[in-house]
Amino acid sequence: MSVSDIEQELQEIYGYRLSTSAISIITDKVNQQVLDWQNRPLEPVYCIVWMDGIVFKVRQGGKVVNKTIYLAVGLNREGYKEILGMWLGQNESAAFWQGVMTDLKARGVEDILVTVTDNLNGFTGAITNVFPMANTQICVVHQIRNSARYVVWKDKKEFAEDMKLIYNAPNRDMAKAELERFAQKWGHKYPYAVQSWQNNWEELTVFFDFPLEIRKIIYTTNLIENLNGKIRKYTKNKMVFPTDESLKKSVFLSLMQISKKWTP
């Protein structure tokens, strides 16, 4: 929100007047808090890091454009969640993700066991460059949604049930056998849907290396999607943000409220 927006809302909602200079002082403090938080030291090791983005509308050069706030949530060795940072971008690219990974490393992260993403463009190469021992798991739920886009309505239920046999298999070998049956059954009718499983197979099946009890939290980005939904609730009254800074402040304040419930 701009200073004038804040001034107007204070007057309309609370009947309280605050000078623009006072509001500016407060918002400047928030800017510093954002900077300090984004550059704070992190733990050396995270067991899992989930990454996803949430799109907002921002004014830029006299136009309204879509920009994405990318978030990283880590699970530390004590089993607690932590929002590691937020990064503003317009396009996913290897260079963008290289910058994000380098930022995490510069803040003290030495290793990540597993990263979970929605097959973000350029991500795998970037994390391999910075954290070569990390495993990258593509979110299976997103894979299911993307595959289903190719399927006509009358086939969707049966197609979904057959996909379920793949990721609910007890181990990777059984999952591979289910994939082969899936390909034989649907490959001619929906080749792109089947090929997307085959092409991403290694990154779709990392979760099989872990105990059954924790597989679901590894193969989905449900945790961070839930976080995104809560951010939407906090920011729903602002359809278009006037600047990048106002967007980052709003998301930061939302994250601070949400993460209070995560504190051990």
Show where each model-derived region lies.
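DNA-recognition alpha helix
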Residues: 2-15
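Amphipathic alpha-helical transducer elements in NTP-driven molecular machines
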Residues: 3, 20, 24, 48, ...
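A detector of single, family-specific signature residues
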Residues: 10, 77, 97, 105, ...
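Residues that mediate protein self-association or partner binding, especially
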Residues: 10-13, 27, 231
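Glycine- and acidic
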Residues: 11, 82-86, 233-234
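RNase H-like nuclease fold core
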Residues: 16, 20, 25-116, 121, ...
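Conserved beta-strand -> loop -> alpha-helix junction used to position metal-binding or nucleic-acid-contacting
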Residues: 114-121, 126-162
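Acidic/histidine-rich catalytic cores and adjacent linkers
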Residues: 165-264
